[in-house]
Amino acid sequence: MDLASLNAFIAVAETGSFSEAGERLHLTQPAVSKRIAALEQQLQVRLFDRLGREVRLTEAGRALLPRAYRILSVLEDTRRALNNLNGDVSGRLTLATSHHIGLHRLPPCCAPSPAPIRRWRWTSASSIRKWPTRRSCTAAPSWR
């Protein structure tokens, strides 16, 4: 079981589409299909029911999904912990704000951050409802 296949599995499960998963992963749809087929063969189970263009998780797929999230999370935590031993502070910072605050108020405040934040993700507070449950918001600032 390799990480590329797990990422493809999660992307298909979240989007419900091999094509959309490919777009998310910057892969072609056949490349995503190949990764899923390899994972299914390795695990000897079908992970998705394919009904025309519709894709649904099988019982095995539903059992694998939370475990796949945990595997990737543990790997990321391990990488972060090892980097932190070197004094590098890293990780993802996700801020959910209103449109105006995210565009106009936060950038000047966040520019002089104490640690170099390599990956910013700006999203509107209203879009949080659409996130899969595994994602979380690091901070949701309020301005008065």
From Swiss-Prot:
Pfam families, A to Z? HTH_1 (PF00126)
Leader sequence segment: none
- The record places the DNA-binding region at 18-38
Q: Does the keyword Nuclease apply?
A: no
Q: Which PROSITE patterns match?
A: HTH_LYSR
Q: Does the keyword rRNA processing apply?
A: no
- Record domain HTH lysR-type: where: 1-58
**Protein name as catalogued:** Uncharacterized HTH-type transcriptional regulator in ibpB-leuC intergenic region
